[in-house]
UniProtKB/Swiss-Prot annotation:
Keywords, comma-separated and alphabetical: Ribonucleoprotein, Ribosomal protein, RNA-binding, rRNA-binding
Function per UniProt: With S4 and S12 plays an important role in translational accuracy.
Protein name: Small ribosomal subunit protein uS5
Subunit structure: Part of the 30S ribosomal subunit. Contacts proteins S4 and S8.
SUPFAM superfamilies referenced in this protein's UniProt entry, alphabetically: dsRNA-binding domain-like (SSF54768), Ribosomal protein S5 domain 2-like (SSF54211)
Species of provenance: Psychrobacter sp. (strain PRwf-1)
Family: Belongs to the universal ribosomal protein uS5 family.
Length: 165
């Protein structure tokens, strides 16, 4: 599960650590890959992958990559703007806004991203591959594609009331 740390106002979550190997003439060379998620709990979130011969070095590289790779998410209070389906590779993630008090109903990788972003009420379901890297990327694709009614109205040149119907 995700390991959580607070650092300079950012919530850092460790999603997964995997041991990988490279086969050479003399045998195998083992190294570690880490997948981390970083967020401020207020709509900014990023993810990163790091690879090194030691676990702490891989985690540190992943955290630095996550801080460089942050996006801003338009939230509707403590939930999402609208239901969204996003995919990356064979992973598909469905995210739906939920009423106050519902909580974050999500699996490990999706939960880490949404909690780091500051989402408090959401329903999610993963379909297809549950590879943590692809699930995190699919979640990011969904959050990036989500737009507020204000943005949609400005893009179409209409009022927010016309958009919401």
């Amino acid at each position: 599960m995700a390991k959580v740390e607070q650092n300079d106002g950012l919530v850092e979550k460790l999603v997964s650590v995997d041991r990988v190997s490279k086969v050479v003439k003399g045998g195998r060379i083992f190294s570690f890959t880490a997948l981390t998620v970083v967020g401020d709990g207020n709509g900014r979130v990023g993810f990163g992958r790091g690879k090194a011969r030691e676990v702490p070095a891989a985690i540190q590289k992943a955290l630095e990559a996550a801080k460089r790779n942050m996006i801003t998410v338009d939230l509707d209070g403590a939930t999402l703007q609208h239901p969204i389906i996003a995919r990356h590779g064979a992973s598909k993630v469905y995210m739906q806004p939920a009423n106050e008090g519902t909580g974050v109903i999500a699996g490990g990788a999706v939960r880490a991203v949404l909690e780091s972003a500051g989402v408090e009420n959401v329903l999610t379901k993963c379909y297809g591959s549950t590879n943590p890297t692809n699930v995190v990327r699919a979640t990011f694709n969904g959050l990036r594609d989500m737009s507020s009614p204000e943005k949609a109205a400005a893009k179409r040149g209409k009022s927010v009331d016309e958009i919401l119907g």
